[in-house]
Amino acid sequence: MAVSARSARTSPGSDKVQKDKAELISGPRQDSLMGKLLGFEWTDLSSWRRLVTLLNRPTDPASLAVFRFLFGFLMVLDIPQERGLSSLDRKYLDGLDVCRFPLLDALRPLPLDWMYLVYTIMFLGALGMMLGLCYRISCVLFLLPYWYVFLLDKTSWNNHSYLYGLLAFQLTFMDANHYWSVDGLLNARRRNAHVPLWNYAVLRGQIFIVYFIAGVKKLDADWVEGYSMEYLSRHWLFSPFKLLLSEELTSLLVVHWGGLLLDLSAGFLLFFDASRSIGLFFVSYFHCMNSQLFSIGMFSYVMLASSPLFCSPEWPRKLVSYCPQRLQELLPLKAAPQPSVSCVYKRSRGKSGQKPGLRHQLGAAFTLLYLLEQLFLPYSHFLTQGYNNWTNGLYGYSWDMMVHSRSHQHVKITYRDGRTGELGYLNPGVFTQSRRWKDHADMLKQYATCLSRLLPKYNVTEPQIYFDIWVSINDRFQQRIFDPRVDIVQAAWSPFQRTSWVQPLLMDLSPWRAKLQEIKSSLDNHTEVVFIADFPGLHLENFVSEDLGNTSIQLLQGEVTVELVAEQKNQTLREGEKMQLPAGEYHKVYTTSPSPSCYMYVYVNTTELALEQDLAYLQELKEKVENGSETGPLPPELQPLLEGEVKGGPEPTPLVQTFLRRQQRLQEIERRRNTPFHERFFRFLLRKLYVFRRSFLMTCISLRNLILGRPSLEQLAQEVTYANLRPFEQVGELSPSNMDSSHSNPPESNPDPVHSEF
């Protein structure tokens, strides 16, 4: 860019002439109140031609180009990380029996080496977008692979990944290469040329919609009452607020109400000149916090990069003017921009104004239609009813960020052989690489269909698949989300019709949450509780582990019958009644009332409690020996308590070994907690370096395979082993390359129903 900067350097007087000329061709200054507030007059909206002229008004390209550069740079960083280039071989390894969840069943991943080629094209597109090199082609090279990878896996969908695709789509049609770009160096007509106002209008409108719709979604009662992110206030980032407020008030006032007000107001604060500095401060603080609170990749930084779009478009030129003269030679141009055919210029000093052409009208139409579509999509749930579960709409484009938190207590997958009638049970998540299928009917249907294709390999013919999934959303009762009596393989599902086998969320029981919190707070530290709600006519089969020596069930509402399977005994419970449950046995809880039943399991993990007491005794004994209050010699099997490790002699007891492992773990946690900042930062850089190193090496291996053919398996194994090395990290660091993420285990056929335990 330095060549472009030097070639346009002019004297201060010449800069002033160019600026005056640009002001003349852009039209008169807006002196009315509306013009000062919004940047346009009512007359600009009085006809289609005037609106087209407004949206194609010549605008400084500087701010748009800076956003293009930052967005492209962040996508370059995103592709090896959240897009998964560094772990692509574990996700798309050829020959894996894996159930996948594309938007359309016809979408299939390419062979592994070709998937690396797809990611390479996407990476080069992001790099070209950042540099402004063959800009339009680079945008397309990034955009097409990005949406292909995005649509290939619904389990990875989220709001910010969807937003990246939208921003790349918008940039494809914009003139973001008219400033600080390689294209500008090579083409004098593009270099430092105006861009039409609609380029900024679309981007600003998109960011405004993200903030505002997210705020509207947070008007949900669960968010306003503080149930959505109840535990977030425990994070150390909220410690300053807890100097004045309790943890509960910090959660309600700061996390929930503060987040609601910020989302509703951020777009307005950024839009108006008078409030922009306040808006920039709060959204910057907000996104910096989010980058530490959540694993959301580049989202916080993309939003930070988008904030300056609301500032005056020429702000980069003003920033450059404050830099030393020598440094300015390496920075973007500060000269006034030149005219562009993409813009419509008004009358200036006796000259007639320019008539808008087809390209100008298409730009204006694109702006209006795109923003209207973005306002409509978050509320289009009545069209895509098949994707409506307890929350409405396709996940990822509704901007309902962090409004719903879920916990899964119990997941059981039952298969029945269609010919023999034999029952069996599958490990939850077998043949998948994600856990997200548990909450969405469309993915559950895809999972069941996939299992019906795979199970015949394990001598299960014409399999029927049943799911019993218990979920709590925003601290409600645990309840079934799908009907466990329905064979999902044969169940009907359509994207445009309501799914009949989705159980309704028991909203009538929401007021119970305050009472449930009271019950939790009244229990001691060793007592746990699980709250259950079930539908009439259904039953829960459960197993009480032998570790849970003191387990009881108490009815809160409705009526249930508890069957003790081994004892062949039934007992009916009514509101307020409870009974003890034997450990190591199965029981069934039938809802016999005409309305949903509510009950709770109260239990103590007696094995864990005894272990904690024994470990506390060993810790106390160790401290007594160290401070001299314990004068008697320790038995040989307890000597490792003082030495911190086993150094020969009698084999320590399992309890002592557990104590030593616990001490080592606590020491490691303390060491990491007290690590200086520069060491933490260095370790962070090493982890990122490994991600990029592995991405590069595995990509080179795959591209070599495509060009020259695959070598022997022994050579491939050596190359992959080398790619997995962490030469920059200390020995003992956990390598994700050694972690198996496929979970492609065969089903467990077991005549005895072994389920997940509460």
Curated annotation (Swiss-Prot):
Q: How does it sit in the membrane?
A: Multi-pass membrane protein
As for what it does, the entry says:
Mediates the vitamin K-dependent carboxylation of glutamate residues to calcium-binding gamma-carboxyglutamate (Gla) residues with the concomitant conversion of the reduced hydroquinone form of vitamin K to vitamin K epoxide. Catalyzes gamma-carboxylation of various proteins, such as blood coagulation factors (F2, F7, F9 and F10), osteocalcin (BGLAP) or matrix Gla protein (MGP).
Q: Which residues cross the membrane?
A: 61-81, 114-134, 137-157, 293-313, 362-382
Q: Which cysteines are joined by disulfide bonds?
A: 99-450
- Catalytic reaction annotation: 4-carboxy-L-glutamyl-[protein] + 2,3-epoxyphylloquinone + H2O + H(+) = phylloquinol + L-glutamyl-[protein] + CO2 + O2
- The Polar residues compositionally biased stretches are 735-747
Compartments, record wording: Endoplasmic reticulum membrane
Topological region Cytoplasmic: 2-60, 135-136, 314-361
The UniProt family comment states:
Belongs to the vitamin K-dependent gamma-carboxylase family.
Q: Which UniProt keywords apply?
A: Acetylation, Disulfide bond, Endoplasmic reticulum, Lyase, Membrane, Transmembrane, Transmembrane helix
Q: Please provide an example of a Pfam family that matches this protein in its UniProt record.
A: VKGC_lumenal_dom
**Please, which domain of life does this record's source organism belong to?**
Eukaryota
One GO MF term attached to the UniProt entry = gamma-glutamyl carboxylase activity
Positions on the Lumenal side per record topology? 82-113, 158-292, 383-758
Show the taxonomic lineage: Eukaryota, Metazoa, Chordata, Craniata, Vertebrata
Q: What EC number(s) has UniProt assigned to this enzyme?
A: 4.1.1.90
Q: What is this protein called?
A: Vitamin K-dependent gamma-carboxylase
The record's region (Disordered) falls at 1-21, 732-758
Write down the top EC class of this protein.
Answer: lyase
Question: Where would one find coiled-coil regions in this protein?
Answer: none
**Gene that encodes it:** GGCX
Organism of derivation:
Pongo abelii (Sumatran orangutan)
Gene Ontology cellular-component terms for this entry are: endoplasmic reticulum membrane
